[in-house]
Amino acid sequence: MSRLKTLVLLLFSCTYLFSEDLENYEVITVVSSIPKASNEIIIAVDKINRDFLDKTQPKDLSSLLRENLAIDVSSNGGIGQLSSTFLRGSNSNHTLVKVNGIKINPSTAGGASIYNLDSDLISNIEIGYGPLSAVHGSTALGGVIDISTRSQIQRSNSSVGFSIGPDSFGKELIRFNQQFTESSFLNIGLSRTNTDGYPVLTSSTLDRGYENTTIIGNLEVNSEFGNFELSSWSANGTVEYLVFGSPVSQEYENYAYGLENSNHVEGILSYKINVTTSKDLIEQNNPNFLGQLDLTNTKRDSLELIVSEMQIFNNPEDFVLGAHIEDEAVDYSSYGTLYEEKITTKSFFGSSYLSFLNTDINTSFRNSDHEIYKSNLSWNFEILKDLNESWRRGISRGSSFRSPVSSELFGFGGNVNLEPEINRSREINLKRTLQNADLSLLIFRSNFTNLINFDYQDYVLKNINKASNKGLEVRYKLQKEDWDLLMIVKAQDPKDETGNQLLRRSKKSASFTLSRELNGFIATANLSYFGERVDFGGINLPSFNLVNIALTKDFNKKFNLSLKLENIMDKDYFTAATSNDFYTNQGRSAWLKINYELGE
């Protein structure tokens, strides 16, 4: 604890070294229906842009979340292997993941397939922590990861890239941006990734490979009928893995397509209409013990209307109302359990923002009408008060939910009488936000109820479990002309109702990322630490720390070279285990990336 106090005091001192007038802030969209500047945000948020991704060179999204944001992420091996993300000590299926604002979580067991997202085609990531169902709907108990593939620089150019790494890793990347007119822009990206992989269990000698083809596209058109934006992300391929030590493989397909129309009706209101569709498909290549080829397929279609700037209010820009309808179709076959079901959820939601006497008040609500369990109300209430010109104190409370997914309702042990899982949380945040430096010190407490688990007496799933978490988080972000710093320290106590530590979640974690421009190079050093964790069967996962270094060099305006040295100390570390074995992670390795911009 003394080390943590010293670090906090150091961070507070650093902010005074770079005190400047408050001018420009990042715009945050993940925690409210009303986009806000970062100095108006109470809830903890991490925002990663393309510049940060280029400097740190993460090999995949899982490693970025773990090593640069101190988030607990468990992996069943290397690139493309199953991974689980635990935000704020919640379960892995309590994290909502969106691509271009479109939900990609499956309606079956487990979380979203973030391991199929190519980090080289991501433009920015926003992560909101805590209960956010009032803004995003079901699943946002622990938080939301919102990933954008939209190009942040609207100019005509094209580029090709190549990457190589250990275990015969190779990637080819093509990007194309076209500015047709001042009011129309297109960007397209394509990547192909292949790796032979390595043995994913300590007792295995079998390499487990991965193939991925990803295509992204965004078309923006501004006209007299409003602004139109078409977004697309698709990924497909093959992944090899182990089941009880035996080699198997599966084909996968993910996509998220959306069409958005926004417009302002002068003197009346502004509106936004979103039409989206997404898919999460897994097809096994090896038959189960019944001789059947299992599959899970979630198809989700949604329609959303958001109305803002309604002139009936005194400050119309500070009020938002919306309606959302979602149709979810699931085709499921697993070890003899088969079903096809459709579920419809209708929601009505709203947000408001008030400011007076140096105090900001944010409120959000959502009433969801689920076809099975009927109505549920989620909400957030936040107060942010100025203490002086630089310091602000925020207090927030919220309630969020996760609807039981189709496999819990209709699968093995299914129960159509299940209720939604609930998280009620509160948070106190002390913030110092400047033009080039942000400091956040917060404490939080979460209580999870109605958690779904298997009742071995009645041999059915029931809402029978509870869990809680409380903790402290410190974030410090500094951006200067030739160097950047991001430091995150977390201490928490995730436990079930019997007091046992929740599986695969650490009590302490930290990340330190420093980038410096030096002699034409950009050098980035990353240090991360995770405390002890526990896995199934009481297996202990030891604490570990990692050191990574990335070097980037622009030889001219067209040619760029990057080198990533990962796990420099060659640590053996584990984030997941089986009943009698550990899943392995990448040892010391080097990753090389070349990018060349075509044309003039």
PLM features: residue spans?
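N-terminal periplasmic accessory domains that precede
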Residues: L61-L64, Q81-F86, K98, S113-D118, ...
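Gram-negative outer-membrane beta-barrel transporters
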Residues: L354-I361, N436, F444-N447, N463-F536, ...
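Extracytoplasmic beta-strand/coil segments of soluble accessory domains associated
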Residues: S62, R66-I102, P106
